[in-house]
Amino acid sequence: MAQHEAEARAYTVTGNPNQGASSLDERAANHTPVHQQGSSYVEISGGVSIDKNTVKVTGHSNLPAGARIKGNLAVKNSLLTGYTDETTIQKDGSFVLRVQRPGIQGSMDLTVLFRPDDQDNEIRNLYGSGGNKLEGPYVYQYEENKQLLHEVRIGAEFDPEQERNTPLVKPVWNKPKDYGSPQVWIKPDVKQEGNYYHVYARSNLLEGSDVKLTIDFPGRWQFGYDDQTKVMPDGSFSMRVKKPSLANRYTIVISFEPNEDMWTNAKQAYGTQGERLSGPLVKSADDKEGSKQIEARIPIQPKS
């Protein structure tokens, strides 16, 4: 067994998560926020409805009236852009976003986004410079001009060919004690959802780290079986990949490759070439610079 396989081999395909929520999140029900509008502790909820032309988001939040929010729709493994909408929060905290549905098939990610730095001064001042006063489970970091800023985000992942309604997902964070350590660990759980494998993983990687998912087929190349995402605030992440229909045995590979485009704090923790990485998941990259990367491998033998 290769050394970098050690952490991942104990995790196999289990159950069908459609029967219940993942341990990494809970489905957010529509409800009236507990905190008043304009509170630094932001609450947001809602649902997504899909028809042949439109992806519609109907939601509620305690963001102040007039706050601008955006809806972005992305299709996995596609470079399509421009599928967005923008609206303002109403006096009662409600909002509606309508995004044109792309005319291609595939799993889609819908994100609702609020950035204090994009608001008028009155609203921006409520949440501090770069959103540093924001609180709650919907707060994420992003980097701009080498500075870490804060935003509010909630979303949903769905296949429009299989789903017509889905809730926005409320995250539940559980940051490990060794979060951000260069001795990286990844604990994945693979669940089969119809024609997809959904990979949920816990790790101690820093928020914003780019992780990739591919499928390694023995003895041959196969395209179109990949996904990528950014690590969440507690080191967790999830990705989805189509289940191969012809292969009997293959390996799901999760990788993290440090590079010059990482956030500043990640460069300090891991090194731009991964030179500070350690632990059983470290693998030498195939380059002349001697770079290091993280790789977790999960052998899969599909169920009938």
Model-flagged regions — what are they?
Residues M1-S78, D85-R220, D227-S304:
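Serine/threonine-biased, Pro/acidic-interspersed low-complexity stretches characteristic
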